[in-house]
C-alpha cells in the first residue's frame, strides 16, 4: 500500500525510478520503498534529496553500502560490474514504516516534486 501510493504520486516525475520485480517469478512485499535518482535527468542527486528531507525532519537513507566497499572487506576479491555501486550512489530508501499516513507519504512526494 505504501509503495503503491509512492508510485502513484511520483509516476510522472522524470528521473525517479522505483525498484520492481524483475519478472513474474518474484513477488516482493515492498517492505521498503526505494527509488533511484537519475541526476542527469532530475538536475539533483540522491544526496541532495536526502539532505532536503533531513531539513524537513524526514528520515531517509541511501541503499545499503555494498560489502566490497566497506573497509573490513577492502582486501577481498570483488566480482561484479559496479551495478551495486551505482545503486548505492543513486538509490534512496524512502520512509516506509507502518505508522505512515497517506498525508506523510504525500508530503515526501511533494518535497521531491518541489526540487524540480
Predicted features along the sequence, with ranges:
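PLP-dependent aminotransferase class I/II
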Residues: 1-116
Amino acid at each position: 500500500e505504501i509503495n503503491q501510493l509512492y508510485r502513484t504520486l511520483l509516476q510522472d516525475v522524470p528521473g525517479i525510478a522505483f525498484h520492481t520485480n524483475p519478472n513474474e517469478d518474484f513477488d516482493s512485499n515492498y517492505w521498503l520503498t526505494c527509488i533511484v535518482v537519475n541526476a542527469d535527468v532530475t538536475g539533483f542527486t540522491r544526496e541532495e534529496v536526502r539532505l532536503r528531507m533531513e531539513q524537513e525532519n524526514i528520515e531517509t537513507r541511501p541503499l545499503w553500502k555494498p560489502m566490497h566497499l566497506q573497509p573490513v572487506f577492502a582486501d577481498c576479491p570483488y566480482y561484479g560490474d559496479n551495478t551495486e555501486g551505482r545503486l548505492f550512489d543513486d538509490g534512496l530508501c524512502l520512509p516506509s514504516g507502518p505508522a505512515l499516513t497517506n498525508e506523510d507519504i504525500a508530503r515526501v512526494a511533494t518535497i521531491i516534486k518541489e526540487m524540480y
